[in-house]
């Protein structure tokens, strides 16, 4: 080890020599390890909850910083120990996109002070993430260690010169120094997920022959020098988190020996904490989607922990306090990182500390309003919490004039509307003809890999009681029942659309609700008409049987090809998908790739899952008819007979508005929300957002 590293390490370890064992003074809580303070020597974190970095779309313009400050302030007030911002580039070529978030000049400091002040005023600490996009930069100025285009980006990067590498190291140090001036307690250096620093480290993307390439020791020098220069620039009383890729999940990634060597070199260079990074963005293995088991990658953090002396942070799919406590109590990490769970519920930490997990609005890892929005250049939000990143715009103010409100339909839109209206002080009655709340949530929870919807239903059951909503199940609301209310909101949902071709009324033809709700037992060969989100869900439901691999990390890793020991380059193994429960054809009338309109960050996962299960996916299909022999179709001019036992129709839906029409005829105004308003696709994101906004305006 170089003497310079030893000197820095000795200085820091003398102060940090981490007191990360259970403190006798830890407050009494159901999760004692989670709420033990973490002593870093020069500062102390109030608990072990890290709000992990997530881009929101508010980082890119100074005019949005008041909103960014409000967003972080709400999480700080919610009890988080340490917050990490979304990524800010250390220079222009490191932008994620043109004119993206950047901190490289003194005049860019002032807006950040709103953010740091808001967080500190609410008792938390905050680090700015330094993220250079490298070859993932979505602009023509991109640079990388070598001129190698990423498979997920149309731009080919320019290879940095040796002088350019030195300038970049200086840029990182300057940005960190500016972050300190802005009031940040530290920085997180993004060294994972396939961004610039990770590109230097992995042989996959570093083909250099100078001192910044070659063997593992030379490939990691870029990262080590960045940490060392930041420590020199910012002093010993400044947090440096290093986001270290513990599993790349791509061919020619780092192996375990190299990862340990890198962690130790980063520690010696001056890092305060090491945060686990899991997978590159171009990896074909999901790492954060809802089908990934909770805490699936915590074991790799536990594997690293004995090799370093600085605290290590476990991450990915840790969405409930029992998962976090289990990881910490087992000694597998010193902190846990949560990003999306704190979008879903800014009070996550406070509720956990109070022993109220039932009150947590749990992240379901859908990505629909957070990551998908960011990749579509929209401001992020959250499917289950539309106030996320919109705290200054969507405000649930106490009403000055309480009214009697009727909400008809206890699906996503109705539940959101009823609970927000009651929270504001209205007297709310929620009607539903069914025997349980949930509507389409009760369908979604049955899909393999979507078990998290059980948590959403648990949350709304709790919220209904907490806010005092009167719930009337097994009740068909009619005009007479609704006549005495001050306002009526209709959230009666949808009716599946029928198809029109010969044999559409054949007993083989069933709706997706028939299948998912168990009204029909389908045979061993099934055709699905419609390859939208519902069609893919039905496909996954039909090819799986028995307990879901989303509940079993070992089975899930075997299916996707993750080496359970995390050895080997990229921690890859040969995928071993389990045999499908039945043969399925997934069909769509429109030409092109089935599932093309699925979520930007999750669609590929659904397609890969069905492909691995042998599902035949066809576009440009003409349906000729159904008879006792099966389904006849025409594709590319060729007629085929699919010898199926059932044809499941997932061809859209129509709004259910019978009650609304009756109320209008009786002269009673009522507002439509959710599927009763727009039924193009079953869209819980839009339904909850609309229901919440309508309630906020009542």
Task: Name the predicted role of every residue range.
Residues 439-485, 595-621:
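N-terminal Rossmann-like dinucleotide/flavin-binding domain of flavoprotein oxidoreductases
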Residues 5, 12-408, 412, 417-428, ...:
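Flavin-dependent oxidoreductase catalytic cores
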Residues 274, 304, 327, 339, ...:
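Hydrophobic, well-ordered secondary-structure elements that form the walls
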Residues 287-293, 395-397, 402, 443-455, ...:
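Short, contiguous acidic/charged loop-to-helix segments that flank catalytic cores in large enzymes
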Residues 308, 331-332, 467, 505, ...:
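Short, structured coil segments at secondary-structure junctions
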Residues 91, 242, 277-281, 432-447, ...:
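Short connector loops at secondary-structure junctions
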Residues 403-433, 437, 472-480, 484, ...:
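Rossmann-like dinucleotide/flavin-binding elements
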